[in-house]
């Protein structure tokens, strides 16, 4: 099935809600403090990530949509760190600074993959004048296609009813990720997206899908909602709308590593898709696919257009398609648990031709999964000259990922993939051409790990260089 992604670049979305900064301090611990019976952590790594409503905005921006973020912060280093991090990923911030309050910050101390303690720096924003938030919403309504209200019960949405009315009066759909059991405050929203536990906290325990539908439809009527999307973890999602049959979508997640931030991804993709002009049903389809991707990543994550495109055509939803190196390592580990043989090859693959396709198909037949490592643009230029590559890296990877024979596509910056191969250690390393096995980059590492190295022949008469020469000759003629 050919599925076209929404035109995210024309979508404008405003996110209003509780913004926060997630700080992580990592380090080893090998002794107990003499001052108290607690471990001593020698901090060697510090990470800062936007959280709460800020993570929703990041998810929208990662799709290529225009994301604006409004929230309450203090006047402190955390607010500055948030603004910088978000600007780096093309989120336009318009924070309301509150000098009497700190920016909400959650500091986690971790050692050996264990969280030892979390320290929260926050004061409720409930008493803060909401008028500056309303003004920012009003100013943006003419240029956005959706408004997301991200509620973490920290006070930024104390006037949520007024915000809903402002948007609905302007004809802008309002999507809300709810918090708590008082859904009365969300009356009149276009769409609520509670997870199953949040939903059941309001309507009671549901033993069957029929009960979810019955109680969900009553909730829609009681609070004058246009729709309700219940996210149900491994059971997928259920979209309920008045006058329409329930739409139940099974989960697309093959491997679940971390559900952190999955709800932010869902509402972000929903909003961006609606703002691009797609229907609510289509938005749920893309959001479900995106959720299947993001839960396969570690930590709070976003989904790129390439990942989403792979997911909706049935590849990335099972951990396949264009990947980062870290994602590939996780996918390979999962494949090995399933007893699958992993084959790996590499090349520039600038202008894909019949020789490439035949070679990759033959390589795939030698195992259960095929990895194709692709030279970056800079690497290609160093190897092939200033006129190459003809096609940029992203396009080369998309084309390769579309081949049925190819399971995973990853890029590398170096002249050879030796470091990458040493990190992956495939069961079989394959290279096309006139090489001797010992001349192939990564062969020593693969052999040392008990793997195999094999040289395959390319199809005669097929060459990217020859194709380029013919094009140049035709232009001259």
Swiss-Prot record:
Top EC class, one word: transferase
Annotated region (Cytidylyltransferase), positions in chain: 344-477
Gene Ontology CC terms, in alphabetical order: cytosol
InterPro entries in the record: Bifunc_HldE (IPR023030), Carboh/pur_kinase_PfkB_CS (IPR002173), Cyt_trans-like (IPR004821), PfkB_dom (IPR011611), RfaE_dom_I (IPR011913), RfaE_dom_II (IPR011914), Ribokinase-like (IPR029056), Rossmann-like_a/b/a_fold (IPR014729)
Effect of residue 198 to D: Loss of activity
Keyword ATP-binding: yes
Binding locations of ATP: 195-198
Gene3D superfamilies membership: 3.40.1190.20, HUPs
Highest taxon of source: Bacteria
SUPFAM superfamilies according to UniProt: Nucleotidylyl transferase, Ribokinase-like
Entry-annotated residues carrying N6-acetyllysine: 179
GO biological process: ADP-L-glycero-beta-D-manno-heptose biosynthetic process; lipopolysaccharide core region biosynthetic process
Keywords: Acetylation, ATP-binding, Carbohydrate metabolism, Kinase, Lipopolysaccharide biosynthesis, Multifunctional enzyme, Nucleotide-binding, Nucleotidyltransferase, Transferase
Active site annotation, chain numbering: 264
Catalyzed reaction equations: D-glycero-beta-D-manno-heptose 7-phosphate + ATP = D-glycero-beta-D-manno-heptose 1,7-bisphosphate + ADP + H(+); D-glycero-beta-D-manno-heptose 1-phosphate + ATP + H(+) = ADP-D-glycero-beta-D-manno-heptose + diphosphate
EC number, UniProt record: 2.7.1.167, 2.7.7.70
HAMAP family: HldE
PANTHER family in UniProt: BIFUNCTIONAL PROTEIN HLDE
Primary role: Catalyzes the ADP transfer from ATP to D-glycero-beta-D-manno-heptose 1-phosphate, yielding ADP-D-glycero-beta-D-manno-heptose.
Subunit structure: Homodimer.
Additional comment: In both reactions the enzyme functions only with beta anomers. The function of the domain II is independent from the activity mediated by domain I.
Protein name: Bifunctional protein HldE
Origin species: Escherichia coli (strain K12)
